Amino acid sequence: MSSIEELARANVRALTPYQSARRLGGNGDVWLNANEYPQAPEFQLTLQTLNRYPECQPVMVINRYAEYAGVTPEQVLVSRGADEGIELLIRAFCEPGKDAILFCPPTYGMYAVSAETFGVERRTAASKSDWQLDLDAIESQLDGTKVVYVCSPNNPTGNLIARDDLRQLLTLAQGKALVVIDEAYIEFCPQASTASWLAEFPHLVILRTLSKAFSLAGLRCGFTLANPEVIQLLLKVIAPYPLSTPVADIAAQALSHEGIAKMKANVAEVTTNRRWLSDILKNIPCIEEVFHSESNYLLVRFTASPSVFKTLWDQGIILRDQNKQPSLAGCLRITIGNRYECERVVAALQSLPGINA
């Protein structure tokens, strides 16, 4: 071990970084592995003040997002993607070596990575066979747990968590832990949002992003919705200038009435393509099951997923392998691209009838 490595914290030396889609690489021309929107939006910068430091919490961005989400500006914090929100909650509420977070695999990987980075215990309550919450398993681990992360729609399975279960979880956790509902994909099923519950549950926190339906993954802009007491605590640990001036400028434009209308058009296109792709995939021989999705991706179980993954990879079609996730053996996740990209996937898979593991 080098002397520099010896200086690092032991948990960081042992840490396996999150394997993001870009980190995994690939040389494709059909990128369906990161749940991005397939077409880049066009914006013109309007703020010519790059010689000045930006606002810590840009007022126009906060106000517009509050209006969009149906909350007050005091209930909104903006950050460098929702991933920073995940991290801020751990920094503000969890004592390393003492407290724990809890999440419900199979689910998004950054909850675990963020906790491990800060030396905070990671607890899991595996989802049931239908990928709904195992409330008994969660309740049995709440002592010493400060933050419970629930993703709905869940990534990578695509299902919504039952609203009655979410309410029951909030009741179980009252006075013990924050319940953080990750709504990164909520624009694809807005009726399922829990933002209206904030007045009822002071320990509810909601994560949002502009990366998915707003087609701004490269912007790195996310939001935390919570009661003002929580927001004020997070403001104590966030960086002094989390959003650059160009990011705030574009985010404000994306949250204008025109920008929100464009987002809704994106959602309509994705929903149409998802339905089309799902219906066709169900009749392809190398596919065992296409799971219902409320998001911009489909989870699919294949008869021989490693062969399928490599075959499509070699054709420049990059999917996301989910085999290492609990209960997802044989599964690949397919982002819903434009119609041409969906057709490329179908053509590649239809050439693989009767593939063997």
Curated annotation (Swiss-Prot):
Catalytic reaction(s) noted: L-histidinol phosphate + 2-oxoglutarate = 3-(imidazol-4-yl)-2-oxopropyl phosphate + L-glutamate
Subunit structure: Homodimer.
Biological or metabolic pathway of the protein: Amino-acid biosynthesis; L-histidine biosynthesis; L-histidine from 5-phospho-alpha-D-ribose 1-diphosphate: step 7/9
Known cofactor(s): pyridoxal 5'-phosphate
UniProt xrefs under Pfam families: Aminotran_1_2
UniProt entry keywords in alphabetical sequence: Amino-acid biosynthesis, Aminotransferase, Histidine biosynthesis, Pyridoxal phosphate, Transferase
GO terms, biological process: L-histidine biosynthetic process
Lineage: Bacteria, Pseudomonadati, Pseudomonadota, Gammaproteobacteria, Enterobacterales
Family affiliation: Belongs to the class-II pyridoxal-phosphate-dependent aminotransferase family. Histidinol-phosphate aminotransferase subfamily.
Enzyme class label: transferase
InterPro entries: Aminotrans_II_pyridoxalP_BS (IPR001917), Aminotransferase_I/II_large (IPR004839), HisP_aminotrans (IPR005861), PyrdxlP-dep_Trfase (IPR015424), PyrdxlP-dep_Trfase_major (IPR015421), PyrdxlP-dep_Trfase_small (IPR015422)
Organism: Pectobacterium atrosepticum (strain SCRI 1043 / ATCC BAA-672)
Name of the protein described by the UniProt record: Histidinol-phosphate aminotransferase
One MF annotation (Gene Ontology) recorded for this entry: pyridoxal phosphate binding
Superkingdom: Bacteria
Modification type N6-(pyridoxal phosphate)lysine: residues: 212
Gene (UniProt): hisC
EC number from the UniProt entry: 2.6.1.9
Cited HAMAP family: HisC_aminotrans_2 (MF_01023)
